[in-house]
């Protein structure tokens, strides 16, 4: 049986602090088995036993009930993570562009309207050095170039402009997550 990863948004940012051991315990208490995490940012690896949409709702409910805040869950297969890594349009574009730490895949709840992405790219063209590109499989690529902390392209702004929820992971994290997903059981 394969594995999926659930990217939980809003974990260990702002005031939403959760120890991964507590998250795993909450998921085990809710009936999930063979749960593991990668890094401290809400990357949960589970057996591929559930419908992704149903799994997302259940995970969001557990976080809300156990930890008292809303989190969006984006469930993806190993193939989708591999595609998000391989399809990175900014890879290898020089030392200031395409760095694995600076390029993020933003996993979206739905494929956004391409015209909304085009409008966002055009609007931001003169405001910063970041670059955006729409991928397939509900992924938006964002090269932060000079770092996330100095960017105006916050997750809230992206969600508002694109009309869907999303949570981001950098390429370094995605490679670690994929390696963990592909480990023998």
Describe the function of each predicted region:
Residues 2-41, 45-185:
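Surface-exposed, charge/polar-rich loops and edge strands
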């Amino acid at each position: 049986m394969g594995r999926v990863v659930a990217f939980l948004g809003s974990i260990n940012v702002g005031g939403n602090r959760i120890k991964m051991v507590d998250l795993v315990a909450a998921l085990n208490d809710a009936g999930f088995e063979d749960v593991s995490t990668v890094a401290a940012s809400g990357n949960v690896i589970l057996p591929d036993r559930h419908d992704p949409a149903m799994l997302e709702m259940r995970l969001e409910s557990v976080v809300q009930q156990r930890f008292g805040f809303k989190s969006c869950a984006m469930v993806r297969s190993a193939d989708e993570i591999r595609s998000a890594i391989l399809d990175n349009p900014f890879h290898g574009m020089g030392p200031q562009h395409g760095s694995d730490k600076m390029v993020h895949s933003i996993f979206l709840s739905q494929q956004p309207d391409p015209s909304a992405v085009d409008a966002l790219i055009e609007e931001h063209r003169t405001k910063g050095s970041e670059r955006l590109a729409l991928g397939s499989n509900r992924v938006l690529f964002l090269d932060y170039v000079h770092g996330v902390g100095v960017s105006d392209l916050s997750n809230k702004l992206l969600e508002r402009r694109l009309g869907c929820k999303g949570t981001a992971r950098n390429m370094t994290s995605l490679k670690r997550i994929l390696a963990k997903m592909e480990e023998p059981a």
